[in-house]
Amino acid sequence: MAKKALIAKANRKPKFRVRAYTRCSRCGRPRAVFRKFGLCRICFREMAHRGELPGVTKASW
């Protein structure tokens, strides 16, 4: 329940712009969020492995 409240709080426009922070659009995790995809590193990895993110390939060098 607390996580849902924090997600709702993050969606609201803050009084000051600096207070805004990114959250994963899938699970609500506040840390390690890729801005381009709006996903945290864990969700990004899972979705990339399943092929749900077009254009994302596993790096190999």
From Swiss-Prot:
Cofactor annotation comment: Binds 1 zinc ion per subunit.
Positions that bind Zn(2+): C24, C27, C40, C43
Xref: InterPro entries: Ribosomal_uS14, Ribosomal_uS14_bact, Ribosomal_uS14_CS, Ribosomal_uS14_sf
Classification via PROSITE patterns: RIBOSOMAL_S14
Cofactors, names only: Zn(2+)
Cellular component GO terms, alphabetical: cytoplasm; small ribosomal subunit
Domain of life: Bacteria
Gene3D superfamilies assigned: 30s Ribosomal Protein S14, Chain N
Keywords linked to the UniProt accession: Metal-binding, Ribonucleoprotein, Ribosomal protein, RNA-binding, rRNA-binding, Zinc
One GO biological process term: translation
Function according to Swiss-Prot or TrEMBL: Binds 16S rRNA, required for the assembly of 30S particles and may also be responsible for determining the conformation of the 16S rRNA at the A site.
Family designation: Belongs to the universal ribosomal protein uS14 family. Zinc-binding uS14 subfamily.
PANTHER family: 30S RIBOSOMAL PROTEIN S14, SMALL RIBOSOMAL SUBUNIT PROTEIN US14M
Protein name (Swiss-Prot/TrEMBL): Small ribosomal subunit protein uS14
Organism the protein comes from: Thermobifida fusca (strain YX)
Name of the encoding gene: rpsZ
